[in-house]
């Protein structure tokens, strides 16, 4: 896989913004080895696969996440050594530049910590992949060897962690998915 400075590669506007941030940061730190990841409802399915194959990437990763997917971004911040920071999409460009340019090698950038009632874990990521990939309940029952009631409970628990009715609502605009 070849990456320049932003992901997903088809998000041109995000790429232009990421290039501007990298340009400003490089003037301060002389480092251009950054990869900015845009985590939102459009990139969610691909991001689940991207972060499982991330060991090939030798770049410093900064995630810009929508508010709804912030628990997932925080999970990747703690689990992936390449990920150094997570910013909400509403964070100003100047704040991102300031925080990234002050980054010390080997440290994570801690931004405002909104307290999330639920933490995402590895099992949730696996479940999310299956629930969002349009797998039917019977297929999921066979794969996980569990009853339908267990599958429905898992789906409900995952939805509650993200504040939606069903996991598939994570792929819809925020105004449609409110509880």
UniProtKB/Swiss-Prot annotation:
A Gene Ontology biological process term: capsule polysaccharide biosynthetic process
Source taxon at top rank: Bacteria
Pathway the protein takes part in: Glycan metabolism; Vi-antigen biosynthesis; Capsule biogenesis; capsule polysaccharide biosynthesis
Entries under InterPro entries matching the protein: TviA
NCBIfam families for the chain: PRK15183.1
Name of this chain's protein: Vi polysaccharide biosynthesis protein TviA
Species, as recorded: Salmonella typhi
Gene name, Swiss-Prot/TrEMBL: tviA
